[in-house]
């Protein structure tokens, strides 16, 4: 099966053909229909192999051997582009058409994460982002997650919770998870912990009601997150994407022991020499437990050619660099 040409042309490569990374070979993840009970058409869906184990993606969207970006932020990316004075409805498309070679069969698509309620609930920003959501809905090779990042938990209210549930139901089949959500005790987050917990719990409830995976953002609050998941009686076999993991392999192993259906997401951080704990995780984690992410527009991979890509932020196509570095780390 060939990847969507319309999507591949939207997200062009940012590297010259002479420096295209070599992608690791990963075995396919078997599809167990019993794990996909929330699919309305279980015979037409599969868990994606290669870089999206555990996510429900229509089989017709999957390309054999293609790498998918399991986590990016197209709304944040669009605003980055606008700050660079790239205007008009084609700004995203224009920006990602670099002078490098097209990704072709190496890049399958992405899961775009919308985690700021101001972007999907109500207000002027939601009107702007609704155009992106509509485009994603119509675009082959783009799937969505909806939720509230702990940094934005103070922007949530009862209306937002209901709107999140409504949108996830309305876009069933295109929305493949709830989140990113979770708890963050880092110095960058000033939202009170009680507020974070309140809306993390609300999103757990929605994920369980719709039988969708959770995409978790956890910083310095792993014990609290586990306690809350236990309080909500989230079963050990619930599907969880532990996004942007930066801890040690010991910590990852402990999490997988508690929630064995989880997947661990590694970002472009893995391409940097100083990220030793992330390298350790890449070296030891079973491939079927691994998800590849760009977290675009964050974590521009170190291997991106400055000659062919002029921006200072990442884009979904850069997941091929993440895949290449993981493959290199495994082989060392």
Label the predicted regions.
Residues 2-332:
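Mid-domain alpha/beta scaffold segments of enzyme catalytic cores
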């Amino acid at each position: 099966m060939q990847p969507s040409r319309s999507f591949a042309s939207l997200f062009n490569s940012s590297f010259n053909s002479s420096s295209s990374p070599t992608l690791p070979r990963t075995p396919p993840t078997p599809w167990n229909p019993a794990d996909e009970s929330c699919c309305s058409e279980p015979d037409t869906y599969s868990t994606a192999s290669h870089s999206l184990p555990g996510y429900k993606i229509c089989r017709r969207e999957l390309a054999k051997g293609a790498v998918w970006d399991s986590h990016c932020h197209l709304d944040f990316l669009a605003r980055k582009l606008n700050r660079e004075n790239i205007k008009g409805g084609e700004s995203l498309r224009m920006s990602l058409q670099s002078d490098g070679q097209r990704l072709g069969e190496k890049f399958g698509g992405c899961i775009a994460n919308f985690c700021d309620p101001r972007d999907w609930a109500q207000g002027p920003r939601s009107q702007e982002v609704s155009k992106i959501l509509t485009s994603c809905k119509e675009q082959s090779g783009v799937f969505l997650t909806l939720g509230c990042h702990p940094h934005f938990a103070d922007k949530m209210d009862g209306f937002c919770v209901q709107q999140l549930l409504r949108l996830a139901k309305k876009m069933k089949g295109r929305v493949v998870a709830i989140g990113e959500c979770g708890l963050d005790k880092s110095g960058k987050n000033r939202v009170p912990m009680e507020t974070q917990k309140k809306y993390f719990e609300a999103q757990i409830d929605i994920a369980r009601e719709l039988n969708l995976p959770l995409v978790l953002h956890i910083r310095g609050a792993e014990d609290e997150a586990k306690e809350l998941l236990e309080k909500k009686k989230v079963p050990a076999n619930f599907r969880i994407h532990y996004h942007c993991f930066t801890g040690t392999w010991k910590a990852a192993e402990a999490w997988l022991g508690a929630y064995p259906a989880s997947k661990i997401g590694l970002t472009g951080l893995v391409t940097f020499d100083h990220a030793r704990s992330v390298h350790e995780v890449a070296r030891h984690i079973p491939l079927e437990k691994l998800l590849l992410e760009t977290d675009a527009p964050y974590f521009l991979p170190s291997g991106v050619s400055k000659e062919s890509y002029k921006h200072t932020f990442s884009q979904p196509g850069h997941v091929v660099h993440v895949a290449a570095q993981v493959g290199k780390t495994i082989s060392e």
